[in-house]
Swiss-Prot record:
GO terms for cellular component: membrane. It comes from Caenorhabditis elegans. The gene is acn-1. Residues 175-765 form the Peptidase M2 domain. Inactive as a metallopeptidase, due to a lack of active site residues. Required for larval molting, male tail development, and formation of adult alae. Acts in the heterochronic pathway and plays a role in the developmental timing of postembryonic hypodermal seam cell division and adult alae production. Acts synergistically with apl-1 in let-7 regulated postembryonic cell division events. Might act downstream of the heterochronic protein lin-41. Expressed in the hypodermis, in the vulva during organogenesis, and in the ray papillae of the male tail. InterPro entries: Peptidase_M2. This is Inactive angiotensin-converting enzyme-related protein. Residues 863-882 have a biased composition (Low complexity).
Length: 906
């Protein structure tokens, strides 16, 4: 009721102001008729007396003496206007995109299609209606004469040629005629492309409309492919590889004859699949109880991520970690079974054990060829190169964890870190602690600037890809077919159940049919992803003229490295400025922003590298059989401590298998060092693409000349090894971690200096000395950072205190003491609240009375404010909150005072 009465009174107060008559100003006398001395109009010694009768003698007309003429003053020369300072010219963009030829991206057809309703698959409905109309029932009366397939096109390929037959095969290696081999390979290519095309189409349909029927169709297509691979591999083994003289023909034969785990007998392959399914099921469905919570237990692995990311009670995290590894210990027999069956499959492919078969993807060994280099030695060399950097990062984080978790039991200043303290269940990603441990407060403003540019320039997700495409064309890459733009999916279609993750660049196994599947959103992350996916598409497009068996990447590690290098290049400030996505102010990046960026990336990616080495070395020992069955868990932690400086949160439990907590061990049965190798290659390729002297952490601008070697390498596809591809791109055909260290150099220097100043112990082979109270750093509170909103005590509003680092909101910033409005805004004070507004309503008569409603309006750009009784802040400021400027008293402001009295009296 008070509010409604106040509102009515306020409206009543405003009406007289806005409806009053505007009176014309009195006309001024000419300059030569105006009296020079206003007091001369009155007689000396006879004061002017105000009366009601204007014709009284006292107020009678008084003669005014004629003024003496004065000489006309010489006209003053007109002042010359001050020349306006010329604006600072904007820097020239590094890339002239106006010179890039525009193309038809299918936007017209896309716009027309967007106005139509989504297509519906009415085939099933029509069949049911026809059946009902003809029979009066929806039950079919047809007699099934054979199996009904979800993918009849794929099924029709089975046994459609001799390449599906495995009867009457000759003995392995018995055919030594190379011409027969060439003829067989030509026929193989013609048959294989049909199968691969159907698998690609089935996958595309399912990923973009994940219905049960389309999933069944994809499964059938993949089963057909498995049958084809098995039969052709058996046929290929008839040829003697040692008799082949042509290196390319030999490489093709090697690709076809390799079966992998498909070489197992069907029953044994089924055992392998069942063991995998059991691992997946146990990992997902195992339940545990929270600390001090009695059964029934309901927490699953999916619930752990948020708990470990936000919980700061180390004892609770230890309880959850120990409970979960104990719960999944039942998977230990299944994992041992996978190791055994993997060894069997490796021997069928000509390898000593599963570890040797895994390494063959990198060392190029085969049944008839020895490894080209010792992969384990190369990995150890990489580790010795990056170990000093990792130890600096490890030491810095270890000290910070003492502050975050209040010096928890088991954490020392010179020993390994307990695995449950990294902010995730498996401890693989340290980035959960970024906000509380980052070196500096300043963050890059590029993401916000880019998002603003996207919105201002009416970007769509497709336009992000078009923008990236124009960048590639400026760097010498060729035109892509129009079908790429008309067939690809760049954004999620919400009327369908799409498989969005992961985004993928797809070779559809048909001439000029290349597509991308991405549920992209406007923003910096997906802008980077657009460049990553496009360079993968270009890899596929450039090797399209190779024979089918060479129409692949040289290695997945090469593709990953190239894709990640281009994602980084897309963040170069000069490139973004050329694309009109950031203003020129972003061309100069502060060192603090660069160090923060590198620190965050190191927590997300670099810290995983030692783990990949530990995980693979442990599994290689399992494949070799060198570790006793009752020592598997002990050995796991010994290796992790050696490479990572990480220890178990509890004493070793021989009945457990703690490694199964990691998806990269329990779910992915392939070398984890693929991550390490591709990450190292990323920086080798980045350094090769950029000019000499480039600061790798900032990237560079590419040109047609700098990408020439890369494009030539891509054209060769898998006809060359990944080491040869690396040599063609970088000039060096071996792994080298020095470019990685060069990239992280600003962060490495900062970590080294910070650890020295804080006297932090580097390494983890100490005696387990605990932190003293003085050594524990003061970290930000849990609500300070993270990816969510800051807590209430970490924000302040205009006029509020910000002395403790609070974030100023609502168009204000901290002047060291309080939050003041940004330049160009006005401060509107209503009661004890301040608001930053763009206009100046003071012209309407608002003032700052003494009542409960106080309205003061003043421009933050005032340079000569009136004196104020309030003391000025002593802290150094850039923009002061100006003192109140008292407005002239008006009937309206008096009415507001009366209004306030009435309001509080109600």
């Amino acid at each position: 009721m008070k509010f409604h009465i106040l509102l009515l009174l306020l409206v009543g107060a405003c009406l007289p102001v806005f409806t009053q008559e505007i009176k014309p100003k009195p006309e001024l006398l000419p300059a030569d008729e105006a009296p020079k001395d206003p007091e001369a109009v009155f007689s000396e010694g006879e004061p002017f007396e105000l009366t009601d009768a204007l014709d009284t003698p006292k107020n009678g007309s008084v003669p005014v003496p004629e003024p003496e003429p004065k000489p006309e003053p010489e006209p003053e020369p007109e002042p010359k206007p001050e020349p306006e300072p010329s604006p600072t010219p904007e820097p020239e963009p590094a890339i002239k995109f106006d010179n890039i030829e525009s193309e038809d991206y299918g936007d017209v057809a896309e716009t027309a299609a967007s106005t139509q309703p989504d297509e519906l698959n009415t085939e099933v409905i029509e069949q049911l209606v026809d059946t009902f109309l003809n029979t009066g029932s929806i039950a079919s009366n047809k007699t099934n004469k054979g199996p009904v397939f979800a993918n009849p096109v794929a099924q029709a390929l089975v046994n459609s040629s001799n390449y599906w037959k495995t009867d009457n095969l000759q003995a392995p290696g018995s055919i030594k005629d190379e011409e027969k081999l060439r003829s067989w390979l030509a026929g193989y290519e013609a048959e294989a492309i049909k199968v691969l095309r159907e698998v690609a189409l089935s996958g595309w349909r399912y990923f973009n409309d994940a219905s049960p029927s389309l999933k069944l169709a994809l499964d059938e297509a993949e089963n057909v492919l498995t049958m084809f691979v098995r039969s052709t591999s058996m046929q290929a083994k008839q040829f003697d590889m040692a008799s082949v003289t042509d290196e390319k023909v030999m490489r093709q034969l090697g690709y076809v004859s390799f079966e992998g785990m498909s070489a197992l007998a069907p029953s044994r392959f089924a055992d392998y699949s069942q063991a995998q399914a059991a691992l997946n099921r146990d990992s997902k469905d195992s339940t545990i109880c929270d600390k001090d919570v009695p059964p029934p237990c309901a927490l699953q692995k999916i619930d752990m991520d948020s708990i470990f990311r936000n919980e700061k009670d180390a004892s609770r995290l230890q309880h959850l970690w120990v409970s979960y590894v104990t719960a999944i210990a039942k998977s230990k027999p299944s994992y041992n079974n996978i190791i055994t069956i993997s060894n069997e499959g490796a021997k069928l492919n000509g390898f000593a054990n599963g570890g040797a078969m895994w390494r063959s993807a990198f060392d190029m060994s085969s049944k008839v060829h020895k490894a080209e280099f010792d992969l384990n030695k190369q990995i150890d060399k990489i580790y010795s190169t990056i170990q000093p950097f990792y130890q600096l990062l490890h030491a810095y984080m270890r000290r910070q964890l003492a502050g975050i978790y209040s010096n928890p039991v088991g954490l020392s200043k010179d020993g390994p870190i307990p695995a449950h303290l990294f902010g995730s269940l498996d401890g693989g990603d340290w980035s959960a602690h970024y906000e509380q441990t980052k070196p500096f407060e300043e963050e890059s403003e590029t993401p916000e600037a880019m998002l603003s540019a996207f919105n201002t320039q009416n970007y769509t997700t497709k336009k992000m890809f078009v923008t990236a495409y124009r960048y590639f064309k400026s760097a010498g890459f060729p035109h892509l077919p129009k079908s790429y733009w008309t067939s690809s999916i760049f954004a999620r279609v919400w009327s369908k159940d799409m498989i969005c993750h992961p985004a993928a660049a797809l070779d559809m196994r048909a001439p000029n049919d290349f597509r991308v599947k991405a549920c992209a959103q406007l923003g910096e992350p997906d802008f980077e992803q657009a460049h990553s996916l496009l360079v993968q598409t270009y890899y596929q497009y450039l090797y399209k003229d190779q024979s089918l068996l060479f129409r692949e990447q040289a290695s997945p590690v090469i593709t990953d490295a190239i894709a990640n290098a281009f994602a980084h290049l897309s963040t170069n400030p000069h490139y973004l400025y050329s694309q009109k996505l950031v203003p020129s102010e972003h061309l100069d990046i502060k060192d603090s922003v660069i160090i923060n960026k590198l620190y965050k990336e190191s927590l997300e990616s670099f810290t995983k590298l030692p783990f990949t080495i530990a995980a693979d070395n442990w599994r290689y020992e399992l494949f070799d059989g060198t570790v006793p069955k009752n020592k598997l868990n002990d050995r796991w932690w010994e290796i992790r401590n050696k490479y990572e400086g990480v220890r178990s949160p509890q004493p070793y439990n021989t009945s457990n298998l703690d490694a199964l907590i990691h998806n990269s061990v329990s779910q992915v049965h392939s070398p984890a060092t693929r991550t390490l190798i591709s990450y190292v290659l990323k920086f080798q390729i980045l350094k090769a693409l950029c000019p000499e002297g480039t600061i790798l952490s900032e990237g560079c601008i590419l040109s047609e000349d700098t990408t020439e070697k890369l494009r030539e390498t891509m054209k060769l596809g898998s006809s060359i090894t990944w080491l040869k591809a690396l040599e063609m791109i970088s000039g060096k055909g071996e792994l080298d971690a020095q470019p990685l260290l060069e990239y992280y150099e600003p962060l490495i220097n900062w970590l080294r200096n910070t650890n020295e100043i804080d006297q932090v112990v580097v390494g983890w082979d100490g005696e387990g000395t605990p932190f003293t109270v003085e050594e524990i750093p003061k970290t930000r509170q849990p609500g300070d950072g993270g990816n969510g909103l800051p807590s209430e005590d970490r924000v302040a509003f205009p006029g509020g205190e910000c002395v403790n680092g609070q974030e100023c909101l609502l168009d204000s910033h901290c002047n060291g003491t309080i939050c003041v409005c940004n330049d160009g805004l006005y401060t509107l004070e209503i009661g004890n609240t301040f608001n930053c507004v763009p206009g100046n309503p003071a012209d309407s008569g608002f003032g700052d009375g003494k009542g409960g409603l106080v309205i003061g309006l003043f421009n933050n750009e005032v340079t000569t404010p009136e004196p104020s009784a309030e003391p000025e802040p002593t802290a150094k400021t850039t923009t002061k909150m100006p003192p109140r400027v008292r407005a002239a008293t008006s009937p309206f402001s008096l009415y507001l005072t009366v209004l306030l009295i009435i309001y509080f009296a109600l």
